[in-house]
Amino acid sequence: CEILFIGAKGKMEMEKVPKAGYQIKGLPISGIDRGNLLSNLSFPLKLQKSLKLAKKILKEFKPDIAIGTGGFASGPLLWQASKQGIPVVIQEQNSFPGITNKLLKNRAEAICVAYEGISQFPAEKVHYTGNPIRSEIFKNLSNREQAIHSYGLDPEKKTILSIGGSQGSRTLNNAWKSDLKKLQDVGVQLIWQTGKLDFDKIKTELDGDLKGIHITEFIYDMKTAFSAADLIVSRAGAMAISELSLVGKPLI
């Protein structure tokens, strides 16, 4: 089975997908900024370019099916796929659908939902599947002591894992910064995923004071991170909730 991912140029997926071993092509698309209407003036041009490029990609790759999860790039790609007679499936990760999936609902052959009772889609197309999760993460978690050693931390101390999501969480980051000394004073360690935007700033502000702290912008090996944690504090993204519900660790 050959898989080609389509993402939005300049977004995180353009870096992360190749690192996971898959091909990806980018579309020059962005979301609509409801808080700054002037920033949306270029959206029609970006959409037009993305539709044209999506059409070209589909003709070259010739997929048997096109699957979208509601991101920026899903719109142009799935719209063109449906026009070319390629079966379209959309997957809605949240309890309330986003704008892209709502616009595509009539062009999809099937709509896979994470939660029951979503009324915004045609009932005859809806399949209650739950969210897809990486099951290998939860099978036989690594040895806690070895996992903590891999982060350069002390297995004798309690360890918190902080997950800010793919983009990071500024709210979480600011909370940890303000109370970091308290953690260090009571001997609690922190594996801190900051996200890319805040990583350099936080590292500079800490100025080498990293006793009992492992700081990283992104975590690729979630199995080891979960294994090391005594407590997990996480941003409540749709996929995060689905996966963390199976970890079996105390969770905030």
Give the ranges of each region predicted by the language model.
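An aromatic- and histidine-rich active-site surface loop
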Residues: 11-15, 63-84
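Active-site-proximal region of nucleotide-activated glycan assembly enzymes
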Residues: 2, 12, 23, 82-145, ...
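Conserved donor-binding/catalytic loop of nucleotide-activated donor transferases
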Residues: 84, 227-229, 243-251
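An amphipathic, basic-hydrophobic alpha-helix
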Residues: 36-65
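Conserved nucleotide-sugar phosphate-binding/catalytic loop shared by glycosyltransferases and other
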Residues: 2-46, 196-198
